[in-house]
Amino acid sequence: MLELRLIVVIVLALLSWQWDPVDSQRPPQHGRRDRPKYPPNKFIKTHPCERSSCYPATGNLLIGRENRLTASSTCGLHSPERFCILSHLQDKKCFLCDTREETKHDPYKNHRIGQIIYKTKPGTNIPTWWQSENGKENATIQLDLEAEFHFTHLIITFTTFRPAAMYIERSFDFGQTWHIYRYFAYDCKESFPGVPTVLENITDVMCTSRYSNVEPSRNGEVIFRVLPPNINVTDPYAEHVQNQLKMTNLRIQMTKLHKLGDNLLDSRLENEEKYYYGISNMVVRGSCSCYGHASQCLPLDPAFSQADNEDGMVHGRCECTHNTKGMNCEECEDFFNDLPWKPAFGKKTNACKKCECNDHAVSCHFDEAVFTASGFVSGGVCDNCLHNTRGQHCEECMPYFYRDPEQDITSERVCQPCDCDPQGSSDDGICDSLNELEEGAVAGACHCKAFVTGRRCNQCKDGYWNLQSDNPEGCEPCTCNPLGTLNNSGCVMRTGECKCKKYVTGKDCNQCMPETYGLSESPEGCSLCNCDAGGSYDNYCDVISGQCRCRPHMTGRSCSQPKQNYFIPLLPEVHEAEVVDECISYGANGNCSLVAETPDGSFTGIGFTRVPENSELVFTVGDIPRSMPYDAVIRYQSTSRGDWENAFITLVRPDQVDPEGGCGELAAATSSETRIPFSLPDRSRQVVALNEVCLEAGKVYKFRIYFERKRHDVDSPTATILVDSLTLIPRIDVTPIFQGSVLADIRKKDYEKYNCKSSLYDMNYKSDPKCQNLDNILSVFVHDGASMCNCNPTGSLSKVCESNGGYCQCKPNVVGRQCDQCAPGTYGFGPEGCKACDCNSIGSKDKYCDLITGQCQCVPNTYGRECNQCQPGYWNFPECRVCQCNGHAATCDPIQGTCIDCQDSTTGYSCDSCLDGYYGNPLFGSEIGCRPCRCPETVASGLAHADGCSLDTRNNNMLCHCQEGYSGSRCEICADNFFGNPDNGGTCSKCECSNNVDLYDTGNCDRQTGACLKCLYQTTGDHCELCKDGFFGDALQQNCQQCECDFLGTNNTIAHCDRFTGQCPCLPNVQGVRCDQCAENHWKIASGEGCESCNCDPIGALHEQCNSYTGQCQCKPGFGGRACNQCQAHYWGNPNEKCQPCECDQFGAADFQCDRETGNCVCHEGIGGYKCNECARGYIGQFPHCSPCGECFNNWDLILSALEDATTATILRAKEIKQVGATGAYTSEFSELDKKLQHIRNLLQNTSVSLVDIEKLDYETQSLRDQLQASHGRLSETEQNLDDIYNSLSLSGVELESLQNHSRLVQQLSKELKENGIQLQESNIEGALNLTRHAYERVSNLSTLKDEANELASNTDRNCKRVENLSNKIQAEADDLANNNKLIEDYRAELTSLTSQIPELNNQVCGKPGDPCDSLCGGAGCGHCGGFLSCEHGAKTHSEEALKVAKDAETAITSKKDQADQTIRALTQAKLNASEAYEKAKRGFEQSERYLNQTNANIKLAENLFIALNNFQENKTASPSESKELAQKTLDLDLKLEPEEIETLGDQINRAVSSLKNVEAIIYRTKPDLDRVNNLQSIANATKEKADKILDSANSVVESLAAADESQGKAKDAIQQANSNIELAGQDLEKIDEETYSAEAPANNTAQQVEKLAKKVQKLQNNIMKNDRDAKEITKEAGSVKLEAMRARGEANNLQSATSATNQTLTDRASRSENARERAKQLLQRASKLTVDTNAKLKDLNDLQTVYLNKNQQLLRLQAEIGPLNKELNEHLIHIKERGSHYRQCYT
């Protein structure tokens, strides 16, 4: 509300105020303004501040303050930086930010902080913005104002996301203290914990999230108001309100970026490229702070002009009213402090009140105590009372003053001072204040010093002068400089002034007058400066040395010479036409061309540009040296008689002429885009096209010169003109060189007298030598000094150029001021200069060539750089003839005539023979061209098995020359002892039978499979590589031996022994090559079932080994049994507890040993009982006499035993019925019965095939085979016909092309004859003669060419007829081919129909598909009966195909795994390379540190040396000033004296010795010493220069080492990044390996299942083959039919449905592996590049080390040389001092 009220008040005040025109033209004033005096009766508008408070307008404080706006982070500030736009991430739209100085005017690249002031570039619609560095979250923008301002609000518009966190702070004491305005954050609690989020008072600091959301992503705003509208402000000038508004510095701190989270998982730098701060516009609204005492503000700098003011800029200095002053009207004016200062508010102006000082003071101050004491009426105390008054109101006189009673209190003379001269009075200037006649005191009389007199003590006594206050005596004797005083007459006693010489001034005649120097004893006293008018800024020089103020790069005392490597440019600015920017041809007269000429001084550059009629030359001129008028001169050369009448020139200016610049007054003379006509006289070489056109320095102009017509009324198509250059000649008559002084007038008269101006326009004009100096003066002025030579280091001999004109010393054949181009007739600009063109005089048009390539301009049919070869298609230079290549090649060898790049499979000198692998007759006119050898296929197919072939001239057939191992007419079969299938794409290989066959025998191997058939030496196998069954050994060495196996220990179920070792197949626990031994701790080999374990008891047996035959273990005492685990013999029981005797009856027991566990004895037959002492069951009698009971007992005993067994079984069956029922009990019986019934049913259903059906099928199969054979024959015949037609067409094309070449040759010859007639007139005599001779030779050959052309025409007619016949024949063949194709399609359809019947036929032969195989013909495992399984729907076929797919999958997986392993190895190698590079870089860094330390030590040594030299220089004893100056000059190691300085030094030396007596003798005696000093000086200078160079080299080494250190750091970072990437890639590869392994396991399982299925099918096949053998022939014929059908159908074995999932998985794995491989490859490349860079850095360091060592040696050598020189220099210096002391004593 307050701000709105202020704006309304200001607007109303402006509407009611009218400025006075006179007053508005007055300069702005600060402080109090005098009231304007208006004429009577004029309507007066009051000032807006006169009756109320007033305020200046608000605005954007950024405008006009780009230099006060800074940012802590700006993208592209040091180098271009890439950034991406988030909204374009799908297309990866990225751009470059380049904020370097050279892109300052490119808003698309430059995003400096100043771009936020305006939304677009001023004057355009191009948007501008500031942008920070990528990923940098802490960024600061700061505005530093030049004064205190009132700040109202801030608006920031972002180009990207608004910051996630930021705060605004300001300072009102110019940055000494800072205060935060407000925090902004997306999450205030997280970003600024503890900061309140509610605003209660205007001074509260709060945090808001209103302007920190993610949306919008572009053009989001952040708005801040200092005084929130929701809080009412009652007193706007309260201290806390003013503190909130006032501001001198503003700072925006951005602390956090909005990110999308992708940087959390991937920390690569690429992810940071889309996160940055960007501000398109920022408005800092405010006004200058004036506290209501000003309505407008002015710039701080009074020199700030209106032209420099930027629209909308708010200035900081208030234009104060109400008698206030200050930057912000914060205090009263010096004389308006009677009331305290207050800000104006509303209608109260609170103006400052004037103090009352009786007109004796101009300023006063406010005193609060005085103000209070006066009752708050007046508090002003006068400051610095004038007129010698004092007091609050200046009502009293000051001490040492007296009051004049005759004057009014306000009179300026009311208090009269004592008026004592302070220089001549004493007692602090006290005078008598009153007239006291009695005491003799006079008011105002002063007390004087000793040599001073007068009432005021202001006069020296006679003989004294120079009244000084610090002189106790007051005055001193007169002292005049004898060198500058005329006749040394002294000074005037009253004034003390001396009488000076002509060019001397000063009270003591001790100063030279302006524009003079060098006070001396000469009659004039000083010498004139005589500064060069062009080389110096003015004619003022140094009063001692006479050195003038030189323009840039000018030197010498008078600034008349350019510095070394600089020159004085020529006055005309020449722009060569040979390098013109554009040449536009508007007619049909041709384009511009370069005409090179040998320089002769009549033109500039390397020649001319030939310009035809209706053409325009465009010159771009951007090197204007000074803004001034110029004459635009065109230098040219006419090519024919007559003036060029119609020509125009247009000057295109880049922009408007600066009205304040040097061309402001002359801008209207020649406006832009105006066509100025001119003509070019044929007898002149130059013309002024534009007269006195003013051009401005620093701008680029275009001069468009249009050569319309040579004759204004007619066209001249052949008219051309040679243009040399566009030359700009400055109008020297307007320069200050010829204006403004007497000397300038003299120079102008001399310039006109010698007609120097003509040499600027006419190159052939020979000017007077005196013009050269005047031209140099003008050129230095126009170019503001000298220009650098810039001699091209490649084309010049040195860097030094001529001082006038700047021409460098060029190498051979190099021209140009800078030696930067080749001379006409040369080319190949390089270190050795340029090479001569050497254009062939016969083959080239002239002697000039291309400056870069050296290509000469060749005449027709010639070729080569020097035009010394024939064109392609010709040979035998200079008599170029057409190449004879039988139509198979377009070019031939230019010297030999050998055809090059023969086509159509031909070769030879004239392409007259066929290439290897081809046969035929390639000669011109033959109908049989070179055809590929088909043995059995062409060489290109890779299926050729012959060394070549040839044409059988008897029948025009092909004869193949078969390679070893092939035979047949087309090498389509394998020779004896070779195998393969060469006719179907295979090859023949030598049978490998391991030298186990008779090589002289035939049929050693199968020609299809290569399996050996006649193995010898007891060998077997496909390659006789194995021993036969029952034999072993190395079959390759023919030493197979028969196996010898022990029949007891050999496993007879395994047929044979090992073929290689002879190891027999042993039974269990049997060992030995012959299987004749039991294994350790085993026995019983004689069992024939292997050996049993001894099982010796570990407690009762002594050893584990038992007897190998009986198995008896060796028992301990008290143990027995075979295994020693029982009691000893004839005892039983547990041996570990107690053994008891057997007690077997000796008559009834068969053995005295009883059962060792139970004690039961083994009885004889018929004997029983525990001890075998009674008759057994079934026997009767009295022991030991027992006999059997008989047959009856035995029969009943058997019956009872059977019934017992049956009863037991019945009980068990009953239990099963109770559990599972009756059927469960008889499951096996029911199953067997079911099988038998099903077998009978199958036999009844599967016997329905008759013999008639089989015969019918056989007939149809044979018919189909015959039809296919006939189709193959017709196809072969058609292919042969097509080949013949193609060859005929090729021959016809060759003949037609030859005819066309001859026709073009005739036309070219005719054209050349016509052109030669014209060229004879323009060329020299020798060239014309050569052309004439050449033309005569060609004319002589025309008759021959005519005959050849006639013959070719006849051949063409014949060929046309032949082509017509061939076309008819081709048409017939095409019809036959179409019929054949139709028949093939019919056969294919019929074959398809037959194929579709095959499953039904198989059903008829084999039974229903899917049934199990039976004894008759098979079933599900086959497609037809008998033989081997081959049907496509059988289980074995599916299994084989599935097995194949699994194996392919396994192969692919293996391949991918190998690729992954290879990638891992590559990554490992890359990591090793990176590690090696890191180690190298580390070693280089350590080595660079050592070099740095050594360099620092040497630098310190050099510094010590220089300190010693300086100390030596400073330690000088007192000597005459002349000797001291000479010694100082001698010790100055950086002596670079110009000739004038040397002369001055000589003059000083002469003056120094002028007062000496016997000067000649002194000079004679000291001459040797002086010579030695001079020599020492030159040696010291040379030593100093070498030391400086060494120091510079050392500094460069240090800088290079620093750069290497920085590069080392970058290399370390890059290596770390590479290691990180390698680790990531390794993790990816491990994942790929795991996934590959997981995919491999199912594939292996599938392979195992398929293998099992194959075994089952094989078993099934064996069962089928045992069945019906009568159907074997039928099966064979059906298999042949199916084979033919599958060939006709193509690829029918594809199992995409079964393997699609596997293929997709493998494809995914392959893709991921490929990605990983590419990533690894990139890492390897980066590591390799890093290695290369590191090696380069190491090489640079090694080179620097070499340089350092060399320089160090030089420094040591120089130190050794400097020591004796210093010693000798000291001796001579002592000698000079002694001589000087001697001469001084003589003088005194």
UniProtKB/Swiss-Prot annotation:
Q: Which residues form the Laminin N-terminal domain?
A: 50-287
Q: Which residues form the Laminin IV type B domain?
A: 567-783
Region of interest: Domain I: 1433-1788
Keywords, in A-Z order? Basement membrane, Cell adhesion, Coiled coil, Disulfide bond, Extracellular matrix, Glycoprotein, Laminin EGF-like domain, Repeat, Secreted, Signal
Q: Specify one Pfam family.
A: EGF_laminin
The answer on whether this UniProt entry bears the keyword Ligase reads no
The annotated region (Domain alpha) lies at 1406-1432
Tell me where it mainly resides. secreted
- Any notes on this protein's domains? The alpha-helical domains I and II are thought to interact with other laminin chains to form a coiled coil structure. Domains VI and IV are globular.
Q: Which GO terms describe its biological process?
A: animal organ development; basement membrane assembly; basement membrane organization; cardiac muscle cell development; cell adhesion mediated by integrin; cell migration; defense response to Gram-negative bacterium; embryonic heart tube morphogenesis
Q: Which residue intervals define the domain Laminin EGF-like in the entry?
A: 288-354, 355-417, 418-477, 478-528, 529-559, 789-836, 837-882, 883-932, 933-990, 991-1042, 1043-1093, 1094-1141, 1142-1188
UniProt key word Coiled coil: yes
UniProt lists compositionally biased (Basic and acidic residues) regions at: 1709-1719
GO MF, one annotated term: extracellular matrix structural constituent
* Function statement: Binding to cells via a high affinity receptor, laminin is thought to mediate the attachment, migration and organization of cells into tissues during embryonic development by interacting with other extracellular matrix components. Required for Ndg localization to the basement membrane.
Q: Motif range for Cell attachment site?
A: 641-643
Q: Which residue spans adopt a coiled-coil conformation according to this UniProt entry?
A: 1255-1405, 1453-1505, 1540-1561, 1608-1762
Q: What happens when the gene is disrupted?
A: Results in strong reduction of Ndg accumulation at the basement membrane in the gut, muscles and ventral nerve cord. RNAi-mediated knockdown in the larvae reduces Ndg accumulation and created holes in the basal membrane of fat bodies.
Q: Segment Disordered: which positions?
A: 23-43, 1690-1719
- Signal sequence bounds: 1-24
Q: What is this protein called?
A: Laminin subunit beta-1
The record's region (Domain II) falls at 1189-1405
Question: Which residues carry a glycan?
Answer: 138, 201, 232, 487, 591, 1051, 1246, 1301, 1330, 1341, 1473, 1493, 1515, 1581, 1644, 1703
Read off the InterPro entries from this record. EGF-like_dom, Laminin/Netrin_ECM, Laminin_IV_B, Laminin_N, LE_dom, LMN_ATRN_NET-like_EGF
Q: Bias category Polar residues: which stretches?
A: 1693-1708
